[in-house]
Amino acid sequence: MLTKSLSPRFLLSVALALCALAVPSFGQTETVLYTFQAGTDAALPYAGLVHDSIGNLYGTTLWGGTYNNGAVFKLDRGGHERVVYSFVGGNDGIAPAASLFLDKGGNLYGTTTRGGSSADAGIVFKIDATGKETVLYRFTGGSDGGKPLASLLRDRSGNLYGTAYSGGYASCLCGTIFKISPAGAETVLHTFGLGADGQFPLGGLIADSSANLYGTTKGGGAYGAGTVFKIDRTGSETELYSFNPGNGTDGSQPSGNLARDAAGNLYGTTLEGGDQNTCLNFGCGTVFKVDPSGNETVLYAFGDQPDGAGPSSGVVLDHAGNLYGTTYSGGPGGPDGFGTVFKVDPLGQETVLYHFSGALDGGFPHCSLLIDRVGNLYGTAFSGGPPETGEGVVFKIKP
């Protein structure tokens, strides 16, 4: 059960350590676009951002809002924030932990980790341009899935696709992949957990031009350390790669969304693994690539300060093939570091673009990043702001 008193480390269960293999860069500057406040404001942002055609940013927070059950917020280009919707609890959702999907009509779609029914298994919701919320589906936590922790994908027909972290087979409750029709009917496309299949999908889905879906699971696979998978139009699943940290260099526990290039290569991060001599011998995590044939390459392994530790939210890809992401901890503060924003180039060279201090600039970024046309990066930090009132920040990193 998520509560506001839980520490960021408990939320991710990340083994922290010092980091020393990166190339620090301090030419980039951070701007705090907004600091969340106590009271009825949104609080504790745990996910990334989406933007509309005029540059407004939208996101979710785990807590805050009128009922302290989480909120959806809008931040305009002038830095003015507005709570678009406050979750009520009960039949409504509680604690949205994923980023939103914004359609051309200005409707926002997302998930909550809790609420919806007595099962407390979460919901899929829609918020229209006026701020009116509609619960599209309430999970039961049974065969349909439960506790969705990831963002949604929407097709041209208005169907929504996503992952549920739990539910599915009664013997495992290892999660599902689901589809929600515009009318709110749910179809389970795949149930995780049998044999060497993946288990516990934390990240969302991406699609190719043939409507194949790709994603990751935190556990399961041939070695119990997570998988990269593909689901075709018929619902048939293929395990593209099973992580094997036992080989001493591979990653473990992929927990974020994937990125895909024009050649069909998939890129992502693992929460642990890589250099087994770091982070209490669990490894501080990796950035990886999986080619269309299922061959994996570790592009970068996080080590000791100041490169960060625990990259949990995946990466975004620019036109030059550079990858950008966040680490939830590490940096110059060592085991108690407040996280970093990083870049990995096509040759596997990592650059720390920014390291958080945990003060007014924010700390513990769990989010995936949003990149604009000129290379500015936008994201959220789970904590930070004035000590008395700060409940996390929205930030911009300028290249």
Residue ranges, per PLM feature:
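Extracellular beta-propeller repeat domains
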Residues: 2-399
